[in-house]
């Protein structure tokens, strides 16, 4: 699995290419977390968001499909006492319906062959009145040289995009699925990151 192979260098590589944007996204997501929240994070990767969230919430379950990525999260969040790490598939979440106040999935929808199924699962486990927060890398409406270079580098190392969103098509994705209460925010970077805040 590509993510097992790149887990140890992922933070260093993304910090060089998009560190400022990633930190900004983490700050924005963290502001949505309340002290009483039970949080599920899908596709936690190396724990960039997890590390910001766990001190703020009541509990957090962080999941990923890559064992190596989970090990990176475990190391990064070694002081957490309210964190559980699970290996899990975002399209087949092993949790009861209405289990979490906040469900977060950062930079994964564009990598999935079935993003709709992932949304269905996140919706299922999120409590009524809760929120799904989904930061996702988006390409510019018109590609620039820097973005093309970044995308080519990802292809070289084996990362395959199953869905390629722009900011406008990202909004269309949620509209097509029938979500009405969605707020969007675009964080500039290379690539930029669109954050969808989906009220349940």
What is the meaning of each model-derived region?
Residues 13-16, 133-188, 192-193:
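C-terminal alpha-helical "lid/dimerization" subdomain adjacent to the S-adenosyl-L-methionine
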Residues 38, 130-131:
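Short glycine-centered segments of the SAM/dcSAM-binding site in methyltransferase folds
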Residues 91-103:
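A short acidic, Gly/Pro-enriched loop at the edge of an enzyme's catalytic core
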Residues 102-114:
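A short SAM/SAH-binding and catalytic strip from SAM-dependent methyltransferases
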